[in-house]
Amino acid sequence: MNAPFVVSPVRHDWSRHEIKALYDLPLLELIARASQIHALYHDPNDLQKASLLSIKTGGCSEDCGYCSQSARRDEVHLDRVEMMSPSDVLAVAAQARDNGADRFCMGAAWRQVRDGAAFDAVLEMVEGVRALGMEACVTLGMLNQSQAQRLKQAGLTAYNHNLDTSPEFYPQIVTTHTYDERLATLEAVRGEGIALCCGGIIGMGETVEDRVALLAILAGFDPHPESVPINALVPVAGTPLGDRQKLDPLEIVRMIATARLVMPDSRIRLSAGRSSLSREAQILCMVAGANSIFSGNVLLTTPNASLDADEALMEALAPR
């Protein structure tokens, strides 16, 4: 065996070397270990369904290489949508709840939160989602401590702010903001006691070492992020990463299993790219430790598995 068996308690001092040893395990051994740890910390039959809505689409000032919403992407065909009204957002949230989602996530395409009418509307949305009996999550870019405090007071459950990749590879993906700025936002959110939703994207041209470095940073947070989205790049024509090849599904499985081992108490969310996976590949991801998915036909601006496909997946997991 190439790595020690992972047991409780939860650790926050994982080295890159230790995580790399886990990542490099033979796949069946890696999945077996991750599945065992998953069962120690979670009900294996518990699969959270979250729903994600773009409440403001396109026109973003940033240049994230994977994203279709940048205002710098003249070659991308995207219908811009200005800020949705709270009533329209809450109608979508209610429908998501009726479709089985218990968390509703709202994303706005901008660099950072700015105080004013738009942010006030977001606060109203958060309050409304909580009143529906759902968890509320937002992804709004960078923010400061006082804005995090207002979100907390509105009842926000979690704030999504992905680190995407390693600090070393990040400048090859984004140039309009820094990794340290991302970390500062996470610190502001943590300072108000809001749960972190923080993960990354694989398939952007990064190395295994970059993936390991990302996991080491996430696993170094105390507490660990409440949820860790593992996204597979969805190449969008016209973006700098639009010509990337489709990721091998087993790379997604390996990333999820390693994340489960080093963050045993977090929800690991099988996120973007899921629509390209077969039903069997998705189930293998769940065996390896994924216990949350996004439900709905679209994730912000990229395709997601259909509701009918997800219904068939749920039936396969737990026949009625």
Curated annotation (Swiss-Prot):
Its cofactor is [4Fe-4S] cluster; [2Fe-2S] cluster. One of its GO terms (biological process) is biotin biosynthetic process. Binds 1 [4Fe-4S] cluster. The cluster is coordinated with 3 cysteines and an exchangeable S-adenosyl-L-methionine. [2Fe-2S] cluster binds at C105, C137, C197, R269. GO terms for molecular function: 2 iron, 2 sulfur cluster binding; 4 iron, 4 sulfur cluster binding; biotin synthase activity; iron ion binding. [4Fe-4S] cluster binds at C60, C64, C67. InterPro entries: Aldolase_TIM (IPR013785), BATS_dom (IPR010722), Biotin_synth/BioAB (IPR002684), Biotin_synthase (IPR024177), Elp3/MiaA/NifB-like_rSAM (IPR006638), rSAM (IPR007197). Its EC number is 2.8.1.6. The keyword Glycosyltransferase does not apply. Residues 45-274 form the Radical SAM core domain. Coiled coil: none annotated. It comes from the Bacteria. It catalyses: (4R,5S)-dethiobiotin + (sulfur carrier)-SH + 2 reduced [2Fe-2S]-[ferredoxin] + 2 S-adenosyl-L-methionine = (sulfur carrier)-H + biotin + 2 5'-deoxyadenosine + 2 L-methionine + 2 oxidized [2Fe-2S]-[ferredoxin]. Pathway: Cofactor biosynthesis; biotin biosynthesis; biotin from 7,8-diaminononanoate: step 2/2. SUPFAM superfamilies: Radical SAM enzymes. Catalyzes the conversion of dethiobiotin (DTB) to biotin by the insertion of a sulfur atom into dethiobiotin via a radical-based mechanism. HAMAP family: BioB. NCBIfam families: bioB. PANTHER family: BIOTIN SYNTHASE, BIOTIN SYNTHASE, MITOCHONDRIAL. Homodimer. This is Biotin synthase. The lineage of its organism: Bacteria, Pseudomonadati, Pseudomonadota, Alphaproteobacteria, Hyphomicrobiales.
